[in-house]
Amino acid sequence: MTPSELKRLYHITKVQLEYGLDELLPEHALTQLPKRLRKGLFWIKNKYPEKTLGERLRLALQELGPVWIKFGQMMSTRRDLFPPHLADQLALLQDQVAPFDGQLAKDQMEMELGGPLDNWFTDFDIKPLASASIAQVHTAKLKDSGREIVLKVIRPDIRPVIESDIRLMYRMARLVEQHIPEARRLKPVKVIEEYEKTLLDELDLRREASNAMQLRRNFEGSEELYVPEVILDLSSEHLMVSERIYGIQVSDIEQLERNGTNMKLLAERGVSVFFTQVFRDSFFHADMHPGNVFVNPDNPENPQWIGLDCGIVGTLNKEDKRYLAENLLGFFNSDYHKVAQLHVDSGWVPADTNVEEFEFAIRMVCEPIFAKPLGEISFGHVLLNLFNTARRFNMEVQPQLVLLQKTLLYVEGLGRQLYPQLDLWATAKPFLETWMAKQVGPAAFVTALSEKAPFWAEKLPELPDLVYDSLRQGKVLNQRMDKLYAGYRQSKRQQAKGQFLFNVGATLLICSAVLLTSNITVLASISAATGAAFWLFSWRAYRR
């Protein structure tokens, strides 16, 4: 560990102790090393005893800087790891930091573009429109068309800072696993691995540009969601240029109401957008917190969502979608046995899981929830309780499901903030039933057949040749198998013969030794020579 890393590690430890975060570690669960470390730093006291543990955790992460803020934001979605009072505080973390110098941002952009900004843009505003831990946004206009755009640029020299803190996180996670036995089930090293991948992905704006373009294609012409256009020719790894939009932030309820927005329709469209992304496109925006969602003000009676910042997206494969839909429908119908069986069938929990015990555990958790009116039930919290229960039965962490749960909680929270009477279940159930109907039965068979029709139309003329080639290859394969089997049998016969000759030779040599001790030298010599000959024959048999 370098001196700078030791200094940073001391600072991290000092901040944690100043906010009393050692309370997160139960005394009885600690080995001797962390106990001695705490005693060794006796002069560092909790400066904020009047605040709750959750508040202190949030404030400590804010003080430690952007890498830790983003880590806290990610951890706020892992409610299987943190109790609600901590997760709720982590969800309040804001990724807003002081902007860096606008001239430095301009220099970075010009380096990415390979020339002065004036070659491509006019009216560049050196004052940032927004600033976050990873990137900063400035406004300008395209020189050739006058179109308003925004330029998002990665903070210079942010990667070394991130990599340094990530290395320290790994060291701390390994120490936690080694010295706090109760924490091992939380797999802290694996948590850091997930975070590292997410964070490093955000450093490549080409990935975000690609995600935004895909989401824009998926909702092209839609009244429900608009995604700003990316100017791909001017974008690179550390710079993304896109269309500038004007909208009302979705959390600004007063402004939405002043604009005459149809709040009920807006809330329902949020749910529709989510389920369309998941079940139609298998590709969903996984960071839909209020800062990334705006509302188009132009047609308030027919409101349209605007999605920004596509750095984090989720995908589901066909099997995940089917099992997820069937699980949700199982909940709608209170069929907990089906929900338990689906978890086993999907491979989300081990195949040897006792389905009856699992069903009982799900029922115990979910029945009190479903005793409420449907309109008061949180869809996201049902999924959260389900996944937490499943993890007690050794369910492996499914990153795509964690992102899905996080996104659903965001969408549901926004929807009920916009329209408190929103019945997400009533909105979602017809959608799920329609989707399931398309996946099974005659209609699904016809759809699958039609999707494969171009492939089979291309391959049909080749079918006779393919059949002939398959038969010929099968015949050749059988001949090879027969030859290999014959060789195997011959080899076994030779081995048996060699073993027999070896045993006879050994017996004769033993006899020659006995005869020699009895001074019967002639017979001893004959027996020894014959035994040696048998050994020679056995060696030749093995060699074949």
From Swiss-Prot:
Pathway listed: Cofactor biosynthesis; ubiquinone biosynthesis [regulation]
Active site per the UniProt annotation: 287
EC assignment: 2.7.-.-
Keyword terms: ATP-binding, Cell inner membrane, Cell membrane, Kinase, Membrane, Nucleotide-binding, Transferase, Transmembrane, Transmembrane helix, Ubiquinone biosynthesis
Transmembrane segments: 515-537
Keyword Membrane in record: yes
Binding residues for ATP: 129-137, 152
Protein localization: Cell inner membrane
Residue ranges annotated for the Protein kinase domain, each copy included: 123-501
GO molecular function, one term: protein kinase activity
Keyword Thylakoid: no
GO cellular component: plasma membrane
An individual GO BP term: regulation of ubiquinone biosynthetic process
Source taxon at top rank: Bacteria
CDD domains: UbiB (cd13972)
Membrane topology: Single-pass membrane protein
Pfam families registered for this protein in UniProt: ABC1
Reported function: Is probably a protein kinase regulator of UbiI activity which is involved in aerobic coenzyme Q (ubiquinone) biosynthesis.
Family as reported in the entry's similarity comment: Belongs to the ABC1 family. UbiB subfamily.
Name this protein carries in UniProt: Probable protein kinase UbiB
Organism from which the protein derives: Aliivibrio fischeri (strain ATCC 700601 / ES114) (Vibrio fischeri)
